[in-house]
Amino acid sequence: MENLPFPLKLLSASSLNAPSSTPWVLDIFLTLVFALGFFFLLLPYLSYFRCDDPPSPSPGKRKCPVGRRRRPRGRMKNHSLRAGRECPRGLQETSDLLSQLQSLLGPHLDKGDFGQLSGPDPPGEVGERAPDGASQSSHEPMEDAAPILSPLASPDPQAKHPQDLASTPSPGPMTTSVSSLSASQPPEPSLPLEHPSPEPPALFPHPPHTPDPLACSPPPPKGFTAPPLRDSTLITPSHCDSVALPLGTVPQSLSPHEDLVASVPAISGLGGSNSHVSASSRWQETARTSCAFNSSVQQDHLSRHPPETYQMEAGSLFLLSSDGQNAVGIQVTETAKVNIWEEKENVGSFTDRMTPEKHLNSLRNLAKSLDAEQDTTNPKPFWNMGENSKQLPGPQKLSDPRLWQESFWKNYSQLFWGLPSLHSESLVANAWVTDRSYTLQSPPFLFNEMSNVCPIQRETTMSPLLFQAQPPSHLGPECQPFISSTPQFRPTPMAQAEAQAHLQSSFPVLSPAFPSLIKNTGVACPASQNKVQALSLPETQHPEWPLLRRQLEGRLALPSRVQKSQDVFSVSTPNLPQESLTSILPENFPVSPELRRQLEQHIKKWIIQHWGNLGRIQESLDLMQLRDESPGTSQAKGKPSPWQSSMSTGESSKEAQKVKFQLERDPCPHLGQILGETPQNLSRDMKSFPRKVLGVTSEESERNLRKPLRSDSGSDLLRCTERTHIENILKAHMGRNLGQTNEGLIPVRVRRSWLAVNQALPVSNTHVKTSNLAAPKSGKACVNTAQVLSFLEPCTQQGLGAHIVRFWAKHRWGLPLRVLKPIQCFKLEKVSSLSLTQLAGPSSATCESGAGSEVEVDMFLRKPPMASLRKQVLTKASDHMPESLLASSPAWKQFQRAPRGIPSWNDHGPLKPPPAGQEGRWPSKPLTYSLTGSTQQSRSLGAQSSKAGETREAVPQCRVPLETCMLANLQATSEDMHGFEAPGTSKSSLHPRVSVSQDPRKLCLMEEVVNEFEPGMATKSETQPQVCAAVVLLPDGQASVVPHASENLVSQVPQGHLQSMPAGNMRASQELHDLMAARRSKLVHEEPRNPNCQGSCKNQRPMFPPIHKSEKSRKPNLEKHEERLEGLRTPQLTPVRKTEDTHQDEGVQLLPSKKQPPSVSHFGGNIKQFFQWIFSKKKSKPAPVTAESQKTVKNRSCVYSSSAEAQGLMTAVGQMLDEKMSLCHARHASKVNQHKQKFQAPVCGFPCNHRHLFYSEHGRILSYAASSQQATLKSQGCPNRDRQIRNQQPLKSVRCNNEQWGLRHPQILHPKKAVSPVSPLQHWPKTSGASSHHHHCPRHCLLWEGI
């Protein structure tokens, strides 16, 4: 009985103290036991019938229906009797149940534990309280006794001493039932007594070194109450005012296991039943499962709240000692970190986190989280041990996070973009995490500076599982670092922070739950913030490291094209011992073995590559030595080459250590002095020794290059001598290339392509020949290309020489000839005071340009022009123009200003200007310069006079192109006589729109046209004796036939108009008048006289009607003008028809040019053609001829007698000239409008819009001799766009212009109503080749408009 549980012990004690116990007491006891067992069996089913009403505010009152729970007393009595009979069997079963419970719970149940739970009450008190409790419980329902043992009740803060579980009475009526437990629960089903709360006491001990996965969170300290969590089933004091057994604070020494064991026997020891074993086992399993579930719920709950929240929640646990509180604080912090990192890891994959953006974000989040948490190496308690729950001040923070941010941004580019190491793509894979090892960072060698992080190797595999196996208390400062480092590396606080940043940003897979480990594993090289030095190790311990550093620096300084050259060129492996190459890196160099091996391979490959380049250079040197026969080689042998000098200066290792290939920082100011004595003026040396700079070295330099290779064989290659030799070779190579590149020379790689040219083309000879080409001294127009380009074939040399000659001649003569003509045009337009005699300047310039064009053609054909050709050209030019004009003409000056070096084919030298006294003299042999461009035209015009024939035969005709006519008559009183414009110029433009080039096809075409019309023109001239003409020597040197009528008309020019003209023009008119007066005595034919000439002379004013610019203005004026001229129809016109019948097949009229200013010298010729047309159309009426003859005689007499009638006619002519000249300029628009209403233009009975006439250039040339003042006035109405078609055939344009010529003179035309046998429709010249069925001029104009 000593070892029985407290209920049985209590019962046994009470039974001993009451010897007079009756059998009914035994029946009651057995009934209670059986009722309790039955209640436990029905308890899972009774949970579904809980009361949903809230508890009443009064402690003993409940509103649940009592009928459901209560049983009748009669049934209870019967049940008690039956239970009394089964009492012996129940006791036996109870003892068996107790033994099974002891076997299941193990050795945790001992007497001491029971004493702590039951209390130190003496047996007397227990015996005294037992009857009271028994009597009191006998009056209460037995079903309501179970909830009083529920451990879910909150502890009473007023209780200060533990009370006995069996002897402590309830403060109020025991009305708490199972239905009261569900008052604050959700409607889902739950386990009543077998389901503990979500925050139960820990079921198992939680030592710091062996955490159990099923362990729940530790309980809070004494004096704390647990606040209700979510999904909680706790009954707080507010929900349950009356509890059966108010529990005090459990002592700290009591473990969770003891608490659980103590509660189970108290429940199961109240009675005996077969179902007790199964109920207790199920309760035990449920407790374990719920504890594990609550642990996961707690972690999930803590992960969704900030650290302050879960610290507060962790503090609300109970039954926690001071050591347990520290352990719980550490565990809660670590759990929160793990949850944070797990959430971050779920965002993306591992490859995404390896990107620089993920590293940056993870590092920022880590810095923020570390700033918010405390230093876990020295954890502080989370709670005070006093009665009041109060949290300590905020946790201690690490160093300023701005330091981390500065260091991170400073090394950000090196962290992520400094890789791959040595800018080699083969090392990309090793920059990140490998399978067996973790590298902090590969050395990010950059071009401009070295990295401040040393390549340290992590030898052990870091895994989160490794740290979970060790308790947090072991992670102290004495923890050994996991990174192997050399003794020379001493971590600094700044370096530690950087190492932490590198670890946390580069390896986010590591759990940050152990910052103390990361803190102790920071290894980095000491570095300054401004200038970072690479590999700052004592050179005394490792003497080969300075050389390695210089090699790495030199490797970094080399351009990228050198590093990638192994893909382009095939390298040849030199015969170097393997030991010398493997000893490039020192043994204790702080890099991983794999990275070390790749670095060595990379350096070997680079050395081999440059060695192969040197071998190729030497092969080219050998090849060039075989061909080295020029004297420049001996001179090159005399002086040391840049390579040789650089080799001599770089032999000592002391100087080699000072050489650093910092090409990026210092491109070249002093590199030539460091790498060798390069010539200061390489361009001068290249001229004298072209092969020295271009790479042709002597045998001595070759020996000096290979000499160190032979001497370094053997044991010396194992030491620093080999490295010095390699450095010298690279230094010489780079210095040589750099010197050539800086001076703009050809690099070594293209030397082979220069060999042939270098041997055959010396630089000095090339310069000499080039200067000779620029200014040749001899007249031989060829270049000796055999000496300059000896490597070419003879045929190629000959063709190249011919091409050079033609090209030179073209560019030497072509541009001046093309520019000369527009220049002359501009100059002549600007000079308005030039006389008519100065118009020969453009003609002479054109002759010279024509001769120059022949010279140019001959030069292109490699035929030097003969001296006779030059003489002929100069003779024609001198005969064509006066010497004074020749000397003063711009063409002559331009010709005299020929630069030196131009080949001269004139043996007599340049022409000299005539003396000043001979400026006004005319040449003895005037040149018959027909502006039509043909000798046949001059012959046809000169058939009227033998003097003209002699002049034509004296000097041959010089053919000039189309532009000659335009330039020759460009400035015939350009500004004063505004009606005279050049054909190639518009009204407001000074620039000619025609080409200034010579075209032989145009010359041939003009000649054919003139030959076609020559017979008719000559016949017509010979068969018209009634027209008197005189050969006049015009001021421009042209012999022209001027009829007498022209003399009269010229003499009729009013004196006022002559006074308004410039002095040069007036002088020209006076000279013309004197010449014509001198020729009157030599007339061959006599003129018939007619007394009716006065009528025709008086009616000369309407003879020059204006040409309006529209047909609408012509139509009304046409009828008026026809009525006005109706009185001119007399029977005296019949002789004209007879004359026309004899010559209608031979008459050829010349075209009047549109924008063409005929000079005064051609005025008589135009009038002659006009009268020829009159007499050819009217053969039946010879009276007008007599009238015209009498008119010319009358006019001639009026000139000398100064009669009033002649003066009036001249005044009228002058007024008409002024009015017509004003039509071509915009500033005389008002005058033009006035004259439009005054004058009319009859157009052969039909309106014809002459604005749409299109002529060819040759038609203009042929009509120039027949152009007159009326033609000029007519051409003013033509548009400027007629120049668009200039190369059309002149046949139809001749006919059309003849019609236009006749339409301009209304005094000889009949009105519409007159029936006259003379009609322009019947008497067109048949030699023109056109049919006579064209009825009116607009039809011909439309024909030419469509051509």
UniProtKB/Swiss-Prot annotation:
Biased composition (Basic and acidic residues): 1108-1127, 1137-1146
Membrane topology: Single-pass membrane protein
Main subcellular localisation: membrane
Compositional bias per record (Basic residues), positions renumbered to this chain: 60-82
An example Gene Ontology biological process: spermatogenesis
Family from the record: Belongs to the SPATA31 family.
Protein name: Spermatogenesis-associated protein 31A1
Species name: Homo sapiens
Gene from which the chain derives: SPATA31A1
